[in-house]
């Protein structure tokens, strides 16, 4: 981009547009040349025939089954060709057998390589195929590889070869030439439809290669051998083509199954129930022999004699199936199955006892796509008993419409990959995970942030929409690829797996790795989980029929719109809900409030810490919208984490002691608030907070107890986000407002009131900021700090509070201070009175020690960390924390005043809490008194100008604050600094830099970085470019995952549930853990659930709806062996998490985290077993 030159405290950028312009142009040209060359080189290697042939062959249908058994009745004249595919010999026509031997010569005429021809008694299969189709039926399918091939497949080894590569018409001629043919013709002709099959309107399917069968009644076994040989030859040939086709067609069209069965009809039967494709591929010549020799006893007496011989051969009860026995997957399945379940069907179909040895059915239908459409109906007809496969049959059927996923050919064959080259695919898949995270964090999310600014969308709505889309983009594109390219359920598997990963693994990991027990706010969790349960329930209902209609997709999208609308009115809804809850009897509310209160002894400390921690996250995340973790300011990007922080978790930990861990809470809180309230950030980030914390679930006790104070404050806080000063001033500082205004005026006019001014001003700043920021930031800082200081410095905190009060207030405040501080205040007030202003500075120094460490850091971080990322913020925080702590005591004077305000708020809340515990009536009265005293104290602080001896220092503090603000703004700019390609210093970071360069450099060349002011106007290009890159990376991820699964033998659904789900969620996992270690459990939990809502209500229905619109509103099949059960499991896991957290009093301890961690792996094991049919889903549809 240019060089960065440090000038003073500012950075100026030297841009070289010309060089940049040419470098980008050359890069594009190079990419075009490389891409075109690659395509040119790859074209010759890709045989289009594979896919096209398969598709053309798939249409092949079994015509024979349609023929009525009557038609199939075999007379000696009847040639097996009636079942166009196979000539079957009837046992009765043993004479024919002799003819059959002579027939080979005839067959020879037709086909130089005659396979043994057997009469197809089942030629007229009773299967419901149309008679014409019956004639063509399975033999055609058997030929799938090439119609011409079928004749070649026929093996002359069987001495009686009637290789009838019949075109439907030639077949008739051949039949006439051989006596066996005559018989078949007689049979076929007997039923006029049978004759039709010979002609085989579907004959085209049969024509290329007809089943040649020797009907040896006397020599069934020898025929078997011949059949075996031919079938074996046939099988290898067909396997190549049939493997994919058969599987796909199995569900869709039995004909494909037939092809597979040719290899092994028995396996074909098994496979047809499960996966016909494999069965077809699996067929062994031995099985084919058995299938080939099929004795069908229809009912003709002569057949009975030969029935025994036929029985020896294979005894395929399916008359129709026996004819095409080898090739027709459906038929073959039935043939073998007939012995089990389908046998009955077969037996009725064959009226005449025929021994049909199908040495090979090489009839390939160059069938039009027509069979594909009818295939579902055909399947139903062919497999009336097959429905045992259940919904799984349907889903395979659809993918079968696209037998092969539309991926480019791999440089390595499956054998090569199994020898170890699959490691490259695994590495590529992992690398793409990192690439997706970088694109989303560095370009897509910032572009979304600019869009929300341009559209002036509120942060809650933006978080629920744009920011959630930024974090879930990989899952959305994986779903699109699964529907339109891979034709599998990989997208559903990825989203369901990602949802479970987010709920169990991410939250469990946060609980395990956080340095303290995570306290959660009930409202955001309750809100998001309620929507999530609603959406999951809808999804389960829609999955019941294994089809998703267009209106079902639309309903899911509308559910998302409802969620966005709720986020828009989140504050009002939350306030209304809490008001409803606050109207309950006090005992109930206190029960809620007491959830986090351990015992009376530690109540003040712990309750306030808990309440504040509980409240802060919700304020911090502005209603805990799902955007919280995807916010570009809070979120440390993967690139920054890898280059600037090799130990992000370690850096998150300033020290091991709890107070400092609480500090970090306080840090992040202001960070996020600074983001939301950047407009309201005034002179400095004063932690001063005069607002008593809004009632979190635990605060409700307080809320009720001082309705006059806290409810107003609650409203004030909600309004504070929007109105800034008004909210607090209305409730607590109305008097203070006037006096503060006066004190500011006085401060300019009078030198005496300068200290009051600081206090007044701090309270103004403290309040204005603390009201604008405060309620968004100051509160969080103050509360975070309160929480920080409450642990160690409650006494000091109260000293600070009350010293601040008493100093500013004079004797008035002593009394009020006594009322509030009760015991401690009086002592500390005595000190403060005696010490006067010195105490302030002592307090300042105390505050400085703790606050500068905390506040200095928090302020530094407040703006820095927001933008720089948590890790950088922490790095810089040290410097600024130190510099501010050392050099800016005055600033801490303000922070102290801020602290005093904070601590006034604390003392109020603490007093409230203690009073609450003491008695409800007292609590209410005291709360009101405290509200009044707080206002009075603040007024006294603002108006008691006698304390103003430190005016100069305070002015200096203000100047320093302004300077600090400028520095912080600069730091913010730095933290928002665009992607930098500067060479790092350490060897380790240099290695990481080189590792990431192949990802970062193309992105840097092709996408404008909207974090640069000059590129901000190109946000649309950045948005679209990011989407293109995310789509490309997602495609590579799914493709390589498919290759890995194919090599190892894992389906795409399982890959999606496990590896892809974890890979796309790892960036969120890293960020969630970092945030949780800072004490913000709410953000981690709410963001995890919120992103899941986006996945289920947008990631899934959008591809489905597009598919339906493109395909004339047809429903899309979605069922999978275990996917439905996985969704039900996800629902149960969600309920478990919620009940567990609620039973633990909204705290997440390490035992709960470890349990969730284990449950995730249990879910994975169960899901994989369901997909592989190792266990069956008890909740099957």
From Swiss-Prot:
Listed InterPro entries: K/Na/Ca-exchanger, NaCa_Exmemb, NCX_ion-bd_dom_sf, SLC24A1
What are the protein's UniProt keywords? Answer: Antiport, Calcium, Calcium transport, Cell membrane, Glycoprotein, Ion transport, Membrane, Phosphoprotein, Repeat, Sensory transduction, Signal, Symport, Transmembrane, Transmembrane helix, Transport, Vision
Provide ranges: composition bias, Polar residues.
124-136, 301-311
* Alpha- repeat intervals: 461-501, 1061-1092
* Sites of Phosphoserine modification: 625
Matching Gene3D superfamilies, A to Z? NCX, central ion-binding region (1.20.1420.30)
Which residue ranges run through the membrane? 420-440, 465-485, 492-512, 520-544, 553-569, 990-1010, 1018-1038, 1054-1074, 1093-1113, 1122-1142, 1151-1171
* Family, per entry: Belongs to the Ca(2+):cation antiporter (CaCA) (TC 2.A.19) family. SLC24A subfamily.
Name the UniProt record assigns to this protein: Sodium/potassium/calcium exchanger 1
Give the organism's phylogenetic lineage.
Eukaryota, Metazoa, Chordata, Craniata, Vertebrata
Gene field: Slc24a1
């Amino acid at each position: 981009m240019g060089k960065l030159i440090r000038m003073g405290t500012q950075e100026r950028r030297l841009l070289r547009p010309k060089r940049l312009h040419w470098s980008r142009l050359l890069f594009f040209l190079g990419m075009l040349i490389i891409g075109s060359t690659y395509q040119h080189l790859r074209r010759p290697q890709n045989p289009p025939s594979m896919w096209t042939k398969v598709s053309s062959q798939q249409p092949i249908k079994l015509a024979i089954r349609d023929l009525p058994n009557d038609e199939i009745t075999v007379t000696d004249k009847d040639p097996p060709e009636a079942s166009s595919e196979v000539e079957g010999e009837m046992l009765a026509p043993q004479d024919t057998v002799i003819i059959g031997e002579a027939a080979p010569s005839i067959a020879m005429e037709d086909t130089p390589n005659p396979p043994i021809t057997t009469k197809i008694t089942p030629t007229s299969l009773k299967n419901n195929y149309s008679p014409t189709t019956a004639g063509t039926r399975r033999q055609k399918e058997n030929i799938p590889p090439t119609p011409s091939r079928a004749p070649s497949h026929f093996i002359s080894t069987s001495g009686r070869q009637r290789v009838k590569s019949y075109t439907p018409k030639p077949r008739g001629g051949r039949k006439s030439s051989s006596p066996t043919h005559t018989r078949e013709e007689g049979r076929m002709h007997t039923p006029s439809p049978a004759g039709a099959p010979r002609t085989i309107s579907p004959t085209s399917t049969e024509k290329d290669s007809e089943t040649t069968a020797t009907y040896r009644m006397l020599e069934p076994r020898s025929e078997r051998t011949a059949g075996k040989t031919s079938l074996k030859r046939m099988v290898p040939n067909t396997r190549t083509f049939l493997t994919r086709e058969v599987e796909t067609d199995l569900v869709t069209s039995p004909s494909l199954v037939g092809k597979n069965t040719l290899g092994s009809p028995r396996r074909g039967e098994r496979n047809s129930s499960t996966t016909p494709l494999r069965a077809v591929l699996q067929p062994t010549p031995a099985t084919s022999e058995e299938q080939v020799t099929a004795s069908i006893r229809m009912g003709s007496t002569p057949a009975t004699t030969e029935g025994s011989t036929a029985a020896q051969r294979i005894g395929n009860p399916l008359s129709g199936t026996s004819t095409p026995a080898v090739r027709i997957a459906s038929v073959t399945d039935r043939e073998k199955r007939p012995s089990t379940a389908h046998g009955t069907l077969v037996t009725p179909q064959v009226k005449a006892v025929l021994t049909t040895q199908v040495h090979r059915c090489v009839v390939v239908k160059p069938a039009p796509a027509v069979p594909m459409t009818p295939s579902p109906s055909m399947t139903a007809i062919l497999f009336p008993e097959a429905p045992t496969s259940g919904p799984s049959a349907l889903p395979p059927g659809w993918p079968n419409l696209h037998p092969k996923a539309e991926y480019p050919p791999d440089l390595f064959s499956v054998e090569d990959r199994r020898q170890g080259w699959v490691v490259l695919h695994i590495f590529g898949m992992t690398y793409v995970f990192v690439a997706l995270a970088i694109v989303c964090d560095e370009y897509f999310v910032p572009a979304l942030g600019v869009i929300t600014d341009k559209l002036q969308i509120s942060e809650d709505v933006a978080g629920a929409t744009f920011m959630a889309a930024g974090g879930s983009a990989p899952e959305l594109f994986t779903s699109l690829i699964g529907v339109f390219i891979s034709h599998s359920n990989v997208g559903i598997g990825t989203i369901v797996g990602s949802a479970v990963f987010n709920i169990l693994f991410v939250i469990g990991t946060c609980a395990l790795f956080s340095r303290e027990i995570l306290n959660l706010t009930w409202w955001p969790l309750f809100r998001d989980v309620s929507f999530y349960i609603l959406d999951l329930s809808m999804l389960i209902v829609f999955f019941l029929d294994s089809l998703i209609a267009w209106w079902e997709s639309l309903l899911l999208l509308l559910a998302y719109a409802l969620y966005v609308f709720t986020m828009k009115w989140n504050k009002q809804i939350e306030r209304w809900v809490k008001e409803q809850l606050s109207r309950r009897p006090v005992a109930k509310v206190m029960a809620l409030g007491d959830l986090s209160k351990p015992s009376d002894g530690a109540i003040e400390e712990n309750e306030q810490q808990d309440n504040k921690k509980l409240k802060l996250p919700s304020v911090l995340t502005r209603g805990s919208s799902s955007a919280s973790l995807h916010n570009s300011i809070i979120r440390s990007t993967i690139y920054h984490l890898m280059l600037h922080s090799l130990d992000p978790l370690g850096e998150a930990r300033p020290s091991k002691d709890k107070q400092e861990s609480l500090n970090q809470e306080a840090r992040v809180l202001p960070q996020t608030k600074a983001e939301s309230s950047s407009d309201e950030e005034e002179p400095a980030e004063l932690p001063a907070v005069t607002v008593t914390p809004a009632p979190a679930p635990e605060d409700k006790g307080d809320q009720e107890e001082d309705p006059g104070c806290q409810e107003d404050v609650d409203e004030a806080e909600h309004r504070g986000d929007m109105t800034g000063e008004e909210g607090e001033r209305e409730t607590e500082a109305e008097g203070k407002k006037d006096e503060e205004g006066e004190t500011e005026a006085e401060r300019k006019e009078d030198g005496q009131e300068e200290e009051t001014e600081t206090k007044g001003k701090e309270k103004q700043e403290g309040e204005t900021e603390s009201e604008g920021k405060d309620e968004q930031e100051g509160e969080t800082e103050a509360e975070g700090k309160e929480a920080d200081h409450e642990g160690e410095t409650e006494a000091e905190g109260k000293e600070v509070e009350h010293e601040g009060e008493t100093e500013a207030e004079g004797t008035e405040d002593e009394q009020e201070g006594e009322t509030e501080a009760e015991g401690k205040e009086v002592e500390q007030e005595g000190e403060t009175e005696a010490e006067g202003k010195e105490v302030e500075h002592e307090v300042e120094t105390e505050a400085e020690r703790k606050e500068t460490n905390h506040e200095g850091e928090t302020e530094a971080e407040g703006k820095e960390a927001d933008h720089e990322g948590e890790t950088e913020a922490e790095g810089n925080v040290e410097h600024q924390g130190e510099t501010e702590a050392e050099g800016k005591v005055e600033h801490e004077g303000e922070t102290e005043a801020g602290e005093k305000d904070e601590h006034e708020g604390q003392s109020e809340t603490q007093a409230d809490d203690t009073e609450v515990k003491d008695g409800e009536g007292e609590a209410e009265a005291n709360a009101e008194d405290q509200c009044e005293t707080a206002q009075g104290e603040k007024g006294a602080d603002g108006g008691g100008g006698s304390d103003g001896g430190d005016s100069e220092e305070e002015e200096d503090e203000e100047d320093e604050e302004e300077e600090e603000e400028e520095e912080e703004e600069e730091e913010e700019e730095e933290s928002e600094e665009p992607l930098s390609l500067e060479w790092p210093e350490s060897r380790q970071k240099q290695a990481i830099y080189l590792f990431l360069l192949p990802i970062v450099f193309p992105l840097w060349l092709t996408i404008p970085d909207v974090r640069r002011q000059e590129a901000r106007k190109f946000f649309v290009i950045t948005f679209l470019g990011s989407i293109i890159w995310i789509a490309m990376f997602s495609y590579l991820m799914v493709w390589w995952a498919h290759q890995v699964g194919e090599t190892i033998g894992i389906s795409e659904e399982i890959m999606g549930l496990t590896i892809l789900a974890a890979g796309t969620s790892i960036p969120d996992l890293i960020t969630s853990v970092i945030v949780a270690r800072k004490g913000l459990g709410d953000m981690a939990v709410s963001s995890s659930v919120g992103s899941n809502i986006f996945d289920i209500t947008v990631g899934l229905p959008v591809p489905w709806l597009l598919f339906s619109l493109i395909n004339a509103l047809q429903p899309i099949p979605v069922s999978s062996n275990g996917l439905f059960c996985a969704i039900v499991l996800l629902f149960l896991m969600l309920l478990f998490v919620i009940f567990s957290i609620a039973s633990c009093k909204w705290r997440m301890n390490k035992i709960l985290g470890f349990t969730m961690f284990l449950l995730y792996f249990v879910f994975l094991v169960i899901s994989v077993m369901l997909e592989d049919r190792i266990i069956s889903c008890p909740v099957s549809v």
